[in-house]
């Protein structure tokens, strides 16, 4: 431990550092000081000392809640004058904080978000309607309209109160008073003597503004009490809720403070977020185009559904990147609980204040790279790769923003609708000017919006989500197997999931019961099964699961032996370090102490496709439970499709491209890359790109494949159909939306919408067995449902539903039932093997054609996409799209950065693009860093792809080429990792000097072998352990200097 003195900027006598603060832009002034002084500095003002932190290294430590807790900064103490001990302005040790937190958590669960969705849409539609009615010469004052929108949203969702801001020329009086009060709270920070009589008028206005806010809130409360209304909103929870720990309700004064808190925090930060997001979009047209394309592709209904909003992944990434650059709540304050040393260098005394300067944290180059000022949403493609505590726009731990999911759902919905309905023009070439109060906003930001003339639908009623649920009845022939569904839930998501499971269980003939985990601490039944659904809360069990977890931790093996169970975990990967901690603990501890796990644990992420993951786990779980208890349960969730089919005479009118947001274009060239005499085929295709498409080295071409003629003929033969026959499909289920519903298509065209070669699923097997009239054949099909048989006979052999239908003609499944059970066809992704620096309107791909004897033993297997592409010739049409992979698989910005590229076989594809780019840069006079390409194949006389190009690049000094041949006569098999091992010392030297490392190709054997070789070389060169070498490689990847583009098999 080396103790250091904390840096401090220049002082000015008694005023200390105070004159350095720009009174209008204090946060930006502090950021400038941080740029000069580094990751920590001390800032003194009369009567107080604050230590500002900027690096993830120190902030990670300061976020340890056992050593530091939320501090009420001086600014928050001033806000406390009107927000009292509300959630945001209370100390953690205050009784009302814990009480309110417990009572209000369910109001921000995933289930609650579904209830708020229709109300959010109500306000969002008002915004769209306002902008639709603007004249062509009128502009939009973005922060002002975003403030109207977010205030109206929290008013309606939280308190069923309509501010009607879009029907006012001036802001609502509450907004005027709130903004003025927040300004005054911040301005007090700049005053050396706040009690100076010169500020008496400010004090008078401050008190008047507080009265305006209190009067409105008191009216909202009084009106609700008088009406007797029981809406499922924040206000009802406040008025009726009781703390589950103490049984105490909130008093009226605290309810007032909570409402003011939510009216401020619930709209100020979100309006700033939306304003910044739109600013960054108009300044980055390529990002705007990508986000708008996603909105158009996903939001296909006139009014977005809750599920569609959850599917706006790129829009969510845009919002996160806006929060990274300008987090609208730009700081949070902590204090040391005891004397301690921060970072092993800076001593702190008990009570010392720390301030996390979030915009600086989000610009830590050791985490985010050198391009921290660039707006690049792709940083958030893989949130789990972002180091812990590197991204903190919502605060920390138990004091993090309770409304995070509310804010992000609202912002995603609104931004998605804006992008769907409007094109935006930055007609003033606006330069960013950030206004600071307690939050940040771009001041004076205006744009013009041109309507895309897409009609709006009606606003859904708040009960839409609930009314859409199926009412399940008890099974007619119930087997009554006991099923206890236990839950641990603070926010309601786990409880709702548990009750859903119990509802389904009843329809399947079980005798279900639902209870909290705590109610069965020390009392788990041995009869029947136990399903456990629980969340984690900052790594701790929910309030109604604490006793159970404590009991389980100390329980003996005798207390759980004989219990048959499965666990489903609810979580949120935004809290990566504690994600699934409690569900995993329960599952692993029960198993370790002798309980029997009858279905694998499920894990669902609230920030991703929670429902999709839950449904997938649920399907497998019911199958496993039925197999364990030898039950013949009705699969009422999956097999009863309402898909109807009628034969008609009409041509197909729905292009496949529309389903996937792709474009149709021409093949410019197609040639074979394997040498004559080779038994295999690798095709090089060059694709013409439309003017709106662009790409960079390392991108993928997503291809919409077509099922080949042979497999289509097998389907039509099995069902006795003519491939040219025209049909029309009708269905109501959302899960069938991938089909061309209410359209007229041929049987052949319909079969291009579905996957025909996926392994048969358990759902499909059960459906086939139910339709099989030959008892021995039905037994054979049902036998495949057994866990080991399914693994060995279905998954390992990739046995398909079509193959089984051909084997068992006694299965009387209808063609419509067959189609309804098939998944949507999936795009296949190929690394682009060219550089746009050579031709920006042409891209090439390198395709290994897959064919051979089917693992299932039923004839020949042909890869759908590779064989489709192999048959394309110059002038043929292809449906495809550009996709940027999630990894940092692109050339470094600095051409002098050394490169190490490993790409055997078709894995060389992206590196061909890299080589072309480097050649162009060299011809432009750029100095290039070393570049080493490790390429492997069977033989230089058989499958040396792009041999002439690569050898020419080496002779021109573009790359150093290292080759490995695995099928040379009288020579041992040599793979790329063997050649790398010989160069180990050189490779580690390059990586120590800042080289970037890339792997492309087989991810099942080649990539792990290459990684193992590289880690061994690092350990040998630096004399460190295997664990240290693995950590080094992981850190290399986290820093964006190691990227993989690999696939299985």
Swiss-Prot record:
Cofactor(s) this protein cannot do without: FAD; FMN; heme
Instruction: Provide one Gene Ontology cellular component.
Output: cytosol
The record's listing under InterPro entries reads:
Bifunctional_P450_P450_red (IPR023206), CysJ-like_FAD-binding (IPR003097), Cyt_P450 (IPR001128), Cyt_P450_CS (IPR017972), Cyt_P450_sf (IPR036396), FAD-bd_FR_type (IPR017927), Flavdoxin-like (IPR001094), Flavodoxin/NO_synth (IPR008254)
Q: Which E.C. number(s) belong to this protein? A: 1.14.14.1, 1.6.2.4
Per the database record, which ranges form the FAD-binding FR-type domain? 660-892
Known consequence of changing residue 331 to P?
Answer: Enhanced activity with small non-natural substrates with altered product profiles compared to wild-type
> Which effect does the record note for changing residue 269 to A?
Contrary to wild-type, significant decrease in the formation of the high-spin complex via substrate binding, and decreased substrate-induced reduction potential shift with saturating concentrations of arachidonate
Positions that bind (9Z)-hexadecenoate = 52
**Biotechnological applications listed in the UniProt record:** This protein is a target of protein engineering. Its selectivity-directing and activity-enhancing mutations have been extensively studied and the designed mutations allow this enzyme to act on non-native substrates and/or in order to enhance production of synthetically desirable end-products.
Report the locations given in the UniProt record.
Cytoplasm
One Pfam family name is: FAD_binding_1
Q: Which of this chain's residues are annotated to bind FMN?
A: 489-494, 536-539, 570-572, 578-580
What does the protein in this record do? Functions as a fatty acid monooxygenase. Catalyzes hydroxylation of fatty acids at omega-1, omega-2 and omega-3 positions. Shows activity toward medium and long-chain fatty acids, with optimum chain lengths of 12, 14 and 16 carbons (lauric, myristic, and palmitic acids). Able to metabolize some of these primary metabolites to secondary and tertiary products. Marginal activity towards short chain lengths of 8-10 carbons. Hydroxylates highly branched fatty acids, which play an essential role in membrane fluidity regulation.
Q: Which family does it belong to?
A: In the N-terminal section; belongs to the cytochrome P450 family.
Q: What is this protein called?
A: Bifunctional cytochrome P450/NADPH--P450 reductase
Biological source species: Priestia megaterium (strain ATCC 14581 / DSM 32 / CCUG 1817 / JCM 2506 / NBRC 15308 / NCIMB 9376 / NCTC 10342 / NRRL B-14308 / VKM B-512 / Ford 19) (Bacillus megaterium)
Lineage at the top is: Bacteria, Bacillati, Bacillota, Bacilli, Bacillales
- The protein's gene is named cyp102A1
């Amino acid at each position: 431990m080396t103790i250091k003195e904390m840096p401090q900027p220049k002082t000015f006598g008694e005023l200390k550092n105070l004159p350095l603060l720009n009174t209008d832009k204090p946060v930006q002034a502090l950021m400038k000081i941080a740029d000069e002084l580094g990751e920590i500095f001390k800032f003194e003002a009369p009567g107080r000392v604050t230590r500002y932190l900027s690096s993830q290294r120190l902030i990670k430590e300061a976020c340890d809640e056992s050593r530091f807790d939320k501090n009420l900064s001086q600014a928050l103490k001033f806000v406390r004058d009107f927000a009292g001990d509300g959630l945001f302005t209370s100390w953690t040790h205050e009784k009302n904080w814990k009480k309110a937190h417990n009572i209000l958590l369910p109001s921000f669960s995933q289930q609650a978000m579904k209830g708020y969705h229709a109300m959010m849409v109500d306000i969002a539609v008002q915004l769209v309607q306002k902008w639709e009615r603007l004249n062509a010469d009128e502009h939009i004052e973005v922060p002002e309209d975003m403030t109207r929108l977010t205030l109206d949203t929290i008013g309606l969702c939280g308190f069923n109160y309509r501010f009607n801001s879009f029907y006012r020329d001036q802001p609502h009086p509450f907004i005027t008073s709130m903004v003025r009060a927040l300004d005054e709270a911040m301005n007090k920070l700049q005053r050396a003597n706040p009690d100076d009589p010169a500020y008496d008028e400010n004090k008078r206005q401050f008190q008047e503004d507080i009265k305006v806010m209190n009067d409105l809130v008191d009216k909202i409360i009084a009106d609700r009490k008088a009406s007797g209304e029981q809406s499922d909103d924040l206000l009802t929870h406040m008025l009726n809720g009781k703390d589950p720990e103490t049984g105490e309700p909130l008093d009226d004064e605290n309810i007032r403070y909570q409402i003011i808190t939510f009216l401020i925090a619930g709209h100020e930060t979100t309006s700033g977020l939306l304003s910044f997001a739109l600013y960054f979009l108009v300044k980055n047209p390529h990002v705007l185009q990508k986000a708008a394309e996603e909105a158009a592709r996903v939001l296909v209904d006139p009014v977005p559904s809750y599920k569609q909003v959850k599917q706006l992944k790129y829009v969510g990434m845009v919002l996160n990147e806006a929060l990274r650059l300008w987090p609208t709540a730009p700081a949070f304050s902590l204090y040391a609980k005891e004397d301690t040393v921060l970072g092993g260098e800076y001593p702190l005394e008990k009570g010392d204040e720390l301030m996390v300067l979030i915009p600086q944290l989000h610009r830590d180059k050791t985490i985010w790279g050198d391009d921290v000022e660039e707006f690049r949403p792709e940083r958030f493609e893989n949130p789990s790769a972002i180091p812990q505590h590197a991204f903190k726009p919502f605060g920390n731990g138990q004091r993090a923003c309770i409304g995070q999911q509310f804010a992000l759902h609202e912002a995603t919905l609104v931004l998605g609708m804006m992008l769907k309905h409007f094109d935006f023009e930055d007609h003033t070439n606006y330069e960013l000017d950030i206004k600071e109060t307690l939050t940040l906003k771009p001041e004076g930001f205006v744009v013009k919006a041109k309507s895309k003339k897409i009609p709006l639908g009606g606003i859904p009623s708040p009960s839409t989500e609930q009314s859409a649920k199926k009412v399940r009845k008890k099974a007619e022939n119930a087997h009554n197997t006991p099923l206890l569904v236990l839950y641990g839930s603070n926010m309601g998501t786990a409880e709702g999931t548990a009750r859903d499971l119990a509802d389904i269980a009843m329809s399947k003939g079980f005798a279900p019961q639902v209870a909290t985990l705590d109610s069965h601490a020390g009392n788990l039944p041995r009869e029947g099964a136990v399903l456990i659904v629980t969340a984690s809360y900052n790594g701790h069990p929910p309030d109604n699961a604490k006793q159970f977890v404590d009991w389980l931790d100390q329980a003996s093996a005798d207390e759980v032996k004989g219990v048959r169970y499965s666990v489903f975990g609810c979580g949120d990967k935004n809290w990566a370090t504690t994600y699934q901690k409690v569900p995993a603990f329960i599952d692993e501890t029960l198993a370790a102490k002798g309980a029997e796990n009858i279905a694998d644990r499920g894990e669902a992420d609230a920030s991703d496709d929670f429902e999709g993951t839950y449904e997938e786990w649920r399907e497998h779980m019911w199958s496993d439970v039925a197999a364990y208890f030898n039950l013949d349960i009705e699969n009422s969730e999956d097999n009863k499709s309402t898909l109807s089919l009628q034969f008609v005479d009409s041509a197909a009118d729905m292009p496949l491209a529309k389903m996937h947001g792709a474009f149709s274009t021409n093949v410019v060239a197609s040639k074979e890359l394997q040498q004559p005499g080779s038994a295999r085929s690798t095709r090089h295709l060059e694709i013409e790109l439309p003017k709106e498409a662009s790409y960079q080295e390392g991108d993928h071409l997503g291809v919409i494949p077509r099922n080949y003629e042979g497999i289509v003929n097998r389907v039509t033969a099995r069902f006795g159909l003519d491939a040219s026959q025209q049909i029309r499909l009708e269905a109501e289920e959302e899960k069938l939306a991938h089909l061309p519903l209410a359209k007229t298509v041929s049987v052949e065209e319909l079969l291009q919408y579905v996957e025909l070669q996926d392994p048969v699923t358990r759902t499909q097997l059960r459906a086939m067995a139910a339709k099989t009239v030959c008892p021995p054949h039905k037994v054979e099909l049902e036998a495949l449902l057994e866990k080991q048989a399914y693994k060995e006979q279905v998954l390992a052999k990739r046995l398909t539903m079509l193959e089984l239908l051909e084997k068992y003609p006694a299965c009387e499944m209808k063609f419509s039932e067959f189609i309804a059970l098939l998944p949507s066809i999936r795009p296949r992704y190929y690394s682009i093997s060219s550089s746009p620096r050579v031709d920006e309107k042409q891209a090439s791909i390198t395709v290994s054609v897959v064919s051979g004897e089917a693992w299932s033993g039923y004839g020949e297997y042909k890869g759908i996409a590779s064989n489709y592409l192999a048959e394309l010739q110059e002038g043929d049409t292809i449906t495809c799209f550009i996709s940027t992979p999630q990894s940092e698989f692109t050339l470094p910005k600095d051409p002098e950065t050394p490169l190490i590229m490993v790409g055997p076989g078709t894995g060389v594809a992206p590196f061909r693009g890299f080589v072309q780019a480097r050649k162009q840069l060299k011809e432009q006079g750029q100095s290039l860093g070393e570049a080493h390409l490790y390429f492997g194949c069977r033989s230089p006389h058989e499958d040396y792809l792009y041999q002439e190009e690569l050898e020419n690049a080496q002779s021109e000094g573009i790359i150093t080429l290292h080759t490995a041949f695995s099928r040379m006569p009288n020579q041992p098999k040599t793979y790329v990792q063997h050649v790398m091992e010989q160069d180990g010392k050189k490779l580690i030297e390059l990586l120590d000097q800042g080289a970037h490392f890339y792997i492309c190709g087989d991810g099942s054997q080649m990539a792990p072998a290459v990684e193992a070789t590289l880690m061994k070389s690092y350990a040998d060169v630096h004399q460190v352990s295997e664990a240290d070498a693995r950590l080094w490689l992981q850190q290399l990847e986290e820093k964006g200097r190691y990227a993989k583009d690999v696939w299985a098999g």
